[in-house]
Structure formats: C-alpha cells, structure tokens
C-alpha cells in the first residue's frame, strides 16, 4: 500500500486509537578532521492515526517512487488473547528523498476477520551506529506491549 500510495487502504488498516511510533535517521556530516565517521541519530515521534496518515499523504506527493523490501519475519501469537498477533520484520525503505533500514513491529488484530486492524506500529533502526547492530533483545515484539 506504500508503493501504490493507497492511503484509503491504510486508513482502513489502522485502528482509530493506534499507537504509531515513527523513527527517522538524522545523518550528520563527517568531522572536518577526517578521522571521525558521521554519527547517526534517530528521532522518534508518536503519531495519532490522523497525523500519521496526513504525513503519509505529503510523503506520497513528494516522492515519485517509494520502494520497500521486507525480510526476517517473526510472527508471535498473543499467549492469552485469541486473534492478536505481533509481527516483527526488517524493512529497507528508500524513496526519492530518504532511505533507512530498520525493524517494524505491527500488532495485528484478526478478531474480526473481515476487517483486520493494526493497533501498534513501531520502527527502530537496524544499526545503533556505523558498526553496531541493534541487539535482537531490544527489537520490539508482542511482549513489549501490555494488552490488558
């Protein structure tokens, strides 16, 4: 739905009270001493469904192409609540203006099979810095969210 820029589909997919955490990698320029590598910082923001979708509309207009590659899927069923699943996956995102590589977590609700919903969407960078992978135990999964 991102690559086809189908905002109507995304509107149906996210629950009205969805927790949406977006991250953006801020790349700084190399130090002038020539010895230091550029540092990467990640800026996180919590968005409501409405503000997230409004921002997507702008991104869709600004970018001719948006490419996504998904891999490393991990699916976990909620231990006590039927129909809830956590999906963690690696996402490589590239567009005309920005690119990143990180992990998405989506909390899916299939209790109404006709209209599945996403209640939680998070993003984390794959790399903590130029040399350090995000430790696997720090990647969000269904255990990070209290669903009571």
Where in the sequence are the language-model features?
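Ser/Thr- (and often Asn-) enriched beta-sheet segments in non-cytosolic proteins
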Residues: 19-21, 65-76, 92, 107-109, ...
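A mature extracytoplasmic/lumenal domain signature
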Residues: 14-17, 24-26, 74, 89-93, ...
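Low-complexity, intrinsically disordered terminal/linker segments enriched in charged
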Residues: 95-148
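Short, aromatic-enriched amphipathic alpha-helices that serve as compact interaction elements
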Residues: 1-9, 13
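Short, solvent-exposed secondary-structure junction/capping segments
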Residues: 12-38
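Loop/turn elements at helix/coil->beta-strand transitions in domains of secreted/extracellular proteins
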Residues: 7-8, 16, 66, 115-116
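Surface-exposed, charged secondary-structure patches
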Residues: 33-99
